């Protein structure tokens, strides 16, 4: 009897997309790529969100705003990123704060992915699908977002300036094709390929 309660509490602790991945995506990928073992099936490992604030040198408050917005979007506090070397043309000193990033894993990762695909992406102006050319050759995908206001967590009236971000989806896929199929099965709205 207690085993049934444990499995029920485990299932309720999973994100909706994680359950969908296990029940629908894994069998579809096993059939498509003829995997012999379920452990060969690629999975989403982490999502890294990065906001660069180039004007943080002149206006330090912009970095605080970016940290606050990224905290609202991701649900966890981001790391402050500092410059590695000085570049005089950009008026940049070594060790100066220039951005922030956050890495999401497990439940938080699946919940963010679900919100990104179902709530944020449809709010992009003139959206015709995400580019399928942003794969890195190792099965990872990076999407550039030009406006942080596509996320429903951000209050448009309180945004001092529009800023963008990079969102990297790191998978265990061995090739870009496997990663493309994995992300497509999870609901990533790529542009339609012209075959």
Swiss-Prot record:
Q: Which family does it belong to?
A: Belongs to the universal ribosomal protein uL5 family.
* Complexes and interactors: Part of the 50S ribosomal subunit; part of the 5S rRNA/L5/L18/L25 subcomplex. Contacts the 5S rRNA and the P site tRNA. Forms a bridge to the 30S subunit in the 70S ribosome.
Q: Which GO terms describe its molecular function?
A: rRNA binding; structural constituent of ribosome; tRNA binding
Q: Where are the transmembrane segments?
A: none
- What's a GO biological-process term for it? translation
Q: What keyword terms does UniProt attach to this protein? A: Ribonucleoprotein, Ribosomal protein, RNA-binding, rRNA-binding, tRNA-binding
Q: Which GO terms describe its cellular component?
A: ribonucleoprotein complex; ribosome
Output the PANTHER family linked to this UniProt entry: 60S RIBOSOMAL PROTEIN L11-RELATED (PTHR11994)
In terms of InterPro entries, this protein maps to: Ribosomal_uL5 (IPR002132), Ribosomal_uL5_bac-type (IPR020930), Ribosomal_uL5_C (IPR031309), Ribosomal_uL5_dom_sf (IPR022803), Ribosomal_uL5_N (IPR031310)
What NCBIfam families does the record tag this protein with?
PRK00010.1
Q: What does this protein do?
A: This is one of the proteins that bind and probably mediate the attachment of the 5S RNA into the large ribosomal subunit, where it forms part of the central protuberance. In the 70S ribosome it contacts protein S13 of the 30S subunit (bridge B1b), connecting the 2 subunits; this bridge is implicated in subunit movement. Contacts the P site tRNA; the 5S rRNA and some of its associated proteins might help stabilize positioning of ribosome-bound tRNAs.
Q: What name appears for this protein in its UniProt entry?
A: Large ribosomal subunit protein uL5
Q: Which SUPFAM superfamilies match?
A: RL5-like
